[in-house]
Amino acid sequence: MNKAELIRNNIEKQVCSFFGSRSVTDFTPGLTPVPYAGRVYDEKELTALVDSALDFWLTAGRYARTFEEKLAEFTGARYSILTNSGSSAD
């Protein structure tokens, strides 16, 4: 494993630790706020985000390609492509 891979692995571990330190697990009815909307993600999504950023893929990259391939397979379509909105897909 080269130096860059070692650093990347360390960053992934740190991101997981960061996520774990921010997670709220206790809920007290009447005291704990329940947001009506908001971001919902786990440590896997957070590490994927950081991993993409380390490759400087700020738009569609290898994760998008993998998702497109799996979506096409799941739906039985020959191809699939991600867009940023329904308007862009027109």
Predicted regions span which residues?
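Conserved PLP-binding active-site segment in aminotransferase class I/II-type PLP enzymes
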Residues: 1-88
